Amino acid sequence: YREAQHPIFVDDHPDKIYLHNKLLECYEKVIEHSPYPIKRIEIPWNGQEIQCLFHMTGEKNAPTVIEVPGMDQTKETFPNPVHNAFIERGMNCLVLDGPGQGKSNMRKIRPTDNNYEQVGSAVIDWLSEQEEVDATKIGISGISMGSFWGMRIAAHDSRISAIATASACFTAKTAIFEESSPRFKQMFMYMAGIDDEDKFDAMASNMTMDQHAKKIKSPSLTIMGEYDP
């Protein structure tokens, strides 16, 4: 259902609504049968709510990782409850549907060049108040566009204690939006609610780590291939 709803780039399309609702319905069964506790939560941000999945060790005061999905992923994509590398290592994991992703997309919460990190801070605020979380040990993991958003969160919020990302997408977005499959640009323009390509290009030009990377103070691990965008 997640893959089926993905290529429908139309707001309020009945097929997209149906398929996304079936995704959520199926994941309720995942929550029911998971070998550890998972909660679906709503975190307030800017007068709206960001839906997340909170995978918990069942212990108090545990280190916690914020998992940032890639551009075309949702919070249901990862981790796999049958083999959750975070839980197996004693860490909680919170996965969010950030602006433009999953439930946020359905709610028309649009990504801009800088609002994902604002949402990230709201998530950290919420985590810091939970008894299951050691607020001094909140890290970030992300893949592809999630690597960029994750790094921006770490640059924006000093409460992040460590960050590990893969398939890096930190620099100018020329490679992903102009040289890769046209689907990437088509997808992000839909997520952002922008029809004008020039307007979108102007926004995308600000989506780099320039002037932001130097603000990151936490230990950072990046896995990058030679041709990653």
Region spans (language model):
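Serine-hydrolase catalytic core
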Residues: 197-229
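Conserved alpha/beta-hydrolase
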Residues: 86-103
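Alpha/beta-hydrolase active-site loop
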Residues: 110-136, 152
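Hydrolase active-site cap/lid region
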Residues: 152-202, 215-218
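N-terminal cap/lid segment of alpha/beta-hydrolase-fold proteins
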Residues: 15-60
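Short beta-strand element of the alpha/beta-hydrolase
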Residues: 61-70
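Gly/Ala-rich beta-loop-alpha elbow adjacent to hydrolase catalytic centers
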Residues: 142-146, 150
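The serine-hydrolase catalytic nucleophile loop
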Residues: 71-84
